Amino acid sequence: MNPGIVYVTLSAYGHAGPWAERRGFDSLVQTATGFNHAEGEAAGVNGPKELPAQMLDHATGYFMAFGAMMARARQAREGGSWHVRVSLAQTGRWLWNLGRLEDGLKTADLPGDAVKPFVEELPSGFGALHSVKPSAALSKTM
């Protein structure tokens, strides 16, 4: 490994074990780890059901960014190179162990007015673009 580098790797099912070399993506890992079956049970359907979002992709991306930042902080203190390893399956295990909200599917949708303060409208070549506003503004990034 190049000295002084922070290296982040992602795998579908983990970096060790019999499935370490298998390729995969969020939907496959959701199915292989039982999330789709649990979603079907919660929704009252007979069989698996897809989740409403690619939660493993999103959460694992946050873990990758956090791991890279922590490795850089450690590198600033101690020097050296650091390797951060994350996997979709381990993220799924972590999320699974958080537990489930009873009647979580019965939660009412937010009305559009409730999110309006957090959305901005920007002009684009395709017309008005609506996006979530930045969560913070830093003096050096403006």
What are these regions (language model features)?
Residues M1-S139:
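Active-site-adjacent "lid/gating" segments in soluble enzymes
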